[in-house]
């Protein structure tokens, strides 16, 4: 294990009650709370190095499926789950399993509330469950993405309601998840793990734990720095995507091929990273996490994080821009959008996964329906899909549909799609991903 530290820990590290495994009659090394796209890969990696692991999830269908050897996460196969089960992994809905663990890692969702602010309900609920089962010597780690200060200001007080003190009796740390669904090159083991402890002894415990199955640990000064690091990563992507999205809109008005400009700029070997226009941002991270940072700035400092909020405004309006371009394309072909049959290709938020969270295909569909278009979809990874509770028809014969529909919009460039064939077959094709540059194909 390689460890990179921001600064030396110093000569003095306060003792932390019982050290790992001493005085604690835990039957397992790890309990993972939340067995979704973050928690399940974490459990798999821990099991793969011989750790005894249990999982806790509120969804009885998820728990039953895992205990039957079935995965519900793209990056974890059924075979992976069966091997985990053979190694002793068990999923539970009862939080009694937590008191058996030396380490508890919280991997629950952190969505937005109805007013657009942070919704820490799942984190608070999970922390209370941990506090109710907390034992001297345990390590608790929060991996859920959140604003700086959450670990110290929300999680720590709840844990200490148990009567145990963080840094003295138990260890508490924050380590942001860096899971990239569908990425086969950079998995949990290969991706450096940022870790920040509430105290130096907490950091040592967390570094030691993750070092068992992650190749490189990056130790932050504390939990706030680790929390900010994750928000910085996602906000960086968010604002750069917004930049190229607005450039795409501007370039069209200026009669500039933005895709060629990006290609040329991308040849610079230093000082530039290429981002590309899209029909909007999706997934649980990019559309959500910058809101947590904006909230913290407004609530703690009393002013707006203008850069982030402008990026949100630009990215949120991209589905509207896509539909407007689609309408213009149909009008140029002599058809109104009203009553036209529109086929959406690829409705997941990223290529080659089945994840529909925050997909821009949803607002695109909603806007097309508002304009009385007849919408259907095709996606090799999605069998059924609905928007606002209304099912979107799925076409079975893609070749026939390409010929029959008035307009085809490529929203996601899954590798299963034969792009030249799409261009040759579709009557009218709008490529929002910049993948098909052929005469007759409209590109975002």
Feature annotation, model-predicted:
Residues 2-444:
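Structural/interface elements that position substrates and couple domains in central-metabolism enzymes
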């Amino acid at each position: 294990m390689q460890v990179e530290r921001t600064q030396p820990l110093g000569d003095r590290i306060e003792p932390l009650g019982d050290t790992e495994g001493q005085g604690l009659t835990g039957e397992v090394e790890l309990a993972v709370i939340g067995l979704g796209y973050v928690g399940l890969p974490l459990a798999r990696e821990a099991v793969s190095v011989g750790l005894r692991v249990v999982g806790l999830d509120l969804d009885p269908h998820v728990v039953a499926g895992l205990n039957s050897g079935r995965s519900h996460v793209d990056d974890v196969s059924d075979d992976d789950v069966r091997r985990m089960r053979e190694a002793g992994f068990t999923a539970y809905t009862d939080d009694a399993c937590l008191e058996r663990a030396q380490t508890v890692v919280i991997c629950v969702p952190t969505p937005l509330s109805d007013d657009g602010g942070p919704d820490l309900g799942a984190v608070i609920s999970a922390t209370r469950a941990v506090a109710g089962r907390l034992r001297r010597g345990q390590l608790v780690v929060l991996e859920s993405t959140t604003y700086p200060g959450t670990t110290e200001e929300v999680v720590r007080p709840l844990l200490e309601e148990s009567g145990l003190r963080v840094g003295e009796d138990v260890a508490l740390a924050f380590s942001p998840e860096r899971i990239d669904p569908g990425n086969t090159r950079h998995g949990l083991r290969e991706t450096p793990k940022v870790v920040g402890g509430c105290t130096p002894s907490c950091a040592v415990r967390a570094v030691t734990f993750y070092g068992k199955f992650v190749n490189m640990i990056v130790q932050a000064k504390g939990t706030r720095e680790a929390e900010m690091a994750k928000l910085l990563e996602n906000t960086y992507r968010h604002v750069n995507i917004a930049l190229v999205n607005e450039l795409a809109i501007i370039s069209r008005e200026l009669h500039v091929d933005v895709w060629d400009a990006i290609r040329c700029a991308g040849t610079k070997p230093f000082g530039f990273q290429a981002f590309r226009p899209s029909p909007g941002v999706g997934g649980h991270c990019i559309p959500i996490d910058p809101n947590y940072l904006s909230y913290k700035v407004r609530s703690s400092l009393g002013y707006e994080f203008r850069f982030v909020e402008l990026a949100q405004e630009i990215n949120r309006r991209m589905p509207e821009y896509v539909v407007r371009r689609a309408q213009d394309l149909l009008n140029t072909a002599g058809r109104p959008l009203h009553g036209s049959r529109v086929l959406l290709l690829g409705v997941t938020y990223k290529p080659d996964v089945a994840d529909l969270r925050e997909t821009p295909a949803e607002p695109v569909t909603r806007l097309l329906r508002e304009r009385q278009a007849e919408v259907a979809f095709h996606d090799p990874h999605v069998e059924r899909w609905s928007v606002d509770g209304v099912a979107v028809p799925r076409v079975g014969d893609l070749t026939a549909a390409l010929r029959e529909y008035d307009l085809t919009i490529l929203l996601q460039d899954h590798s299963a799609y034969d792009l030249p064939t799409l261009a040759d077959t579709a009557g009218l094709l709008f490529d929002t991903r910049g993948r098909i540059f052929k005469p007759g194909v409209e590109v975002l």
